[in-house]
């Protein structure tokens, strides 16, 4: 299994904090966001880690060196991560976890996702419905919709982490190919939403309140800094 971390964007909603530094390299306690995430993947046996970089790509390479692999995406100013992920579609060929680059979470979240069955498994949190991140609708073991769901109909939130096996990768590639012309502002999850709304099986892993945060704004970053000590108590996975 490999991990692909989508880290090409500018993080403009975090300005001025991210004017000269990618948000994945912001500090949470003694580690950067991505130092922590990469360590967590490795602790759970995922050693093939690919960073998709764009904005300030040289800072990532100086920071991580040969610790990870890199692919560069140059059009980060004009597109969202649907196009970022499509630019490395040749990497979607076997078991893979795709992660946003701004996640702070407990080890158990990744562990639960790895253990969850299904060709496509989206990590969601049904313990709350947040306004400023992707919302989902679920029923039993299947995902019904993602992103376009109204708060009233939402079951919870997508946390920015998903797993695909080889068949799931083929389905993802097929779904992205159908929408890649245009849709410059969309996330790759549009392809997942189209699948689920058409009745195709998309599974989900419910982390159900295990601590996680996605950092998109200065307010969210400040809030995570206030509770950073809570992320130091990761549950040990045997």
Regions found by a protein language model. Give the residues of each.
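N-terminal nucleotide-binding beta1-loop-alpha1 segment
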Residues: 1-18
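Conserved N-terminal catalytic core of the sugar/cofactor nucleotidyltransferase
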Residues: 2-5, 27, 31-95
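Active-site glycine-centered loops adjacent to acidic/histidine catalytic or metal-binding residues
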Residues: 9, 102, 217
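Phosphate- and divalent-cation-binding pockets in alpha/beta enzyme and binding domains
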Residues: 13, 59-62, 108, 171, ...
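Conserved beta-loop-beta/alpha segment of the NTase-like Rossmann-fold superfamily
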Residues: 62-134, 140, 166-167
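Catalytic-core segments of class I nucleotidyltransferases/pyrophosphorylases
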Residues: 114, 144-212, 219-222, 226-237
């Amino acid at each position: 299994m490999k991990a692909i971390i989508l880290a090409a964007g500018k993080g403009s909603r975090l300005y001025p904090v991210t004017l000269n530094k990618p948000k994945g390299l912001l500090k949470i306690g003694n580690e950067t966001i991505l130092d922590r995430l990469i360590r967590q993947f490795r602790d759970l046996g995922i050693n093939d880690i690919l960073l998709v970089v764009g904005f300030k790509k040289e800072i990532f390479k100086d920071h991580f060196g040969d610790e990870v692999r890199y692919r560069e995406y140059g059009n980060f100013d004009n597109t969202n991560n649907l196009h970022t992920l499509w630019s490395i579609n040749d990497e979607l060929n076997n078991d893979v976890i795709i992660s946003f680059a701004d996640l702070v979470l407990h080890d158990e979240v990744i562990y639960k996702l790895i253990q969850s069955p299904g060709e496509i498994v989206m990590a969601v949190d049904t313990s709350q419905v947040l306004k400023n991140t992707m919302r989902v609708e679920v029923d039993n073991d299947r995902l019904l919709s993602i992103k376009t769901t109204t708060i009233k109909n939402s079951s919870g939130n997508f946390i920015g982490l998903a797993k695909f096996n080889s068949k799931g990768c083929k389905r993802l590639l097929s779904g992205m190919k159908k929408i890649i012309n245009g849709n410059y502002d969309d996330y790759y999850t549009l392809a997942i939403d189209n699948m689920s709304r058409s009745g195709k099986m998309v599974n989900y892993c419910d982390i159900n309140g295990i601590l996680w945060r996605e950092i998109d704004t200065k307010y969210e970053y400040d809030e995570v800094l206030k509770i950073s000590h809570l992320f130091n108590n990761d549950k040990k996975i045997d």
